[in-house]
Amino acid sequence: TAAPVVRADRHREDALNWSKRLAEMISSQGPFDAVFIGRTSGQYGVGAVAPNGDVLEGDAAAPAFESATREFVEQIKPATESVVFMRGTQWPYFNVTTCLAENNGAGAECTFPRTRADDALAAAEMRGAEEAYPGHVFQVDPAPIACPTGMPRCPTVAPDGTIIMRDGSHLTTTFA
């Protein structure tokens, strides 16, 4: 993100500097057919720093992420035909294999909520990107595959018995 990020009450100047260097690198090395931007659901238990220095947490950080993404995409759009956002899947926030082992492989005991911690921030980033580069911004969302729409909770074991998550945040190679 190009937003001034904070995590654990610590300003993340390193993330801001990395984002600036990345935009410069993309701009100088293009043209590209597409630039892919990944995000992870669990990463954004963070906030952003407002221009006045206040720390904005959770959904309150959405305007800062929207503005920062708009700025980032404005910088890179001359170097790419498209910008593709890769959404993260839901995170169980517990170790799935441990849960399955403790419950004799009973996946029903190890389900987790469908919600993603980053929904508001991801939507804000998409708005910012689309405002900067209308018609050239796309999103790939693997969540409906890992957590099918219509299910009240996300499974950890697929109907064919394949374990979906290998820990608290990663899909298994077999499932992926």
Predicted regions and their residues:
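Extracellular glycan-modifying ectodomains
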Residues: 1-176
